[in-house]
């Protein structure tokens, strides 16, 4: 199944985070924070402005992004994988290599 977001929505696959602290302590799943980074897997057509024009999204498929800890509260399971659906404005930054 393929997910096609509408308007300024973005679909993100959350990155796997290390469950070990800097001191080498392994964190149980309940104590580990959810990662706030991910990869964009689908992008909507853009935001509709007040004058009716559509502003294209600033992110594209494949971008590595950082988002806030409470962003992407909409989780969708697609082919057994949890994906986040959020507005483009919930993305804080694009990670450039």
From Swiss-Prot:
<keyword id="KW-0143">Chaperone</keyword>
<dbReference type="InterPro" id="IPR018369">
    <property type="entry name" value="Chaprnonin_Cpn10_CS"/>
</dbReference>
<dbReference type="InterPro" id="IPR037124">
    <property type="entry name" value="Chaperonin_GroES_sf"/>
</dbReference>
<dbReference type="GO" id="GO:0051085">
    <property type="term" value="P:chaperone cofactor-dependent protein refolding"/>
</dbReference>
<keyword id="KW-0963">Cytoplasm</keyword>
<dbReference type="InterPro" id="IPR011032">
    <property type="entry name" value="GroES-like_sf"/>
</dbReference>
<dbReference type="GO" id="GO:0046872">
    <property type="term" value="F:metal ion binding"/>
</dbReference>
<dbReference type="GO" id="GO:0044183">
    <property type="term" value="F:protein folding chaperone"/>
</dbReference>
<dbReference type="GO" id="GO:0005524">
    <property type="term" value="F:ATP binding"/>
</dbReference>
<dbReference type="InterPro" id="IPR020818">
    <property type="entry name" value="Chaperonin_GroES"/>
</dbReference>
<comment type="similarity">
    <text>Belongs to the GroES chaperonin family.</text>
</comment>
<dbReference type="GO" id="GO:0051087">
    <property type="term" value="F:protein-folding chaperone binding"/>
</dbReference>
<dbReference type="GO" id="GO:0051082">
    <property type="term" value="F:unfolded protein binding"/>
</dbReference>
<protein>
    <recommendedName>
        <fullName>Co-chaperonin GroES</fullName>
    </recommendedName>
</protein>
<dbReference type="Pfam" id="PF00166">
    <property type="entry name" value="Cpn10"/>
</dbReference>
<comment type="subunit">
    <text>Heptamer of 7 subunits arranged in a ring. Interacts with the chaperonin GroEL.</text>
</comment>
<dbReference type="GO" id="GO:0005737">
    <property type="term" value="C:cytoplasm"/>
</dbReference>
<comment type="function">
    <text>Together with the chaperonin GroEL, plays an essential role in assisting protein folding. The GroEL-GroES system forms a nano-cage that allows encapsulation of the non-native substrate proteins and provides a physical environment optimized to promote and accelerate protein folding. GroES binds to the apical surface of the GroEL ring, thereby capping the opening of the GroEL channel.</text>
</comment>
């Amino acid at each position: 199944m393929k997910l096609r977001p509408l308007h300024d929505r973005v679909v993100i696959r959350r990155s796997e985070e290390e469950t070990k602290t800097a001191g080498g302590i392994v964190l149980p799943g309940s104590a580990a924070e959810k990662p706030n980074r991910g990869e964009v897997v689908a992008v909507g057509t853009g935001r509709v402005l007040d004058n009716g024009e559509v502003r294209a999204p600033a992110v594209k498929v494949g971008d590595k992004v950082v988002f806030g800890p409470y962003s992407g509260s909409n989780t969708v399971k697609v082919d057994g994988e949890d994906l986040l659906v959020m507005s483009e404005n919930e993305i804080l930054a694009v990670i450039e290599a």
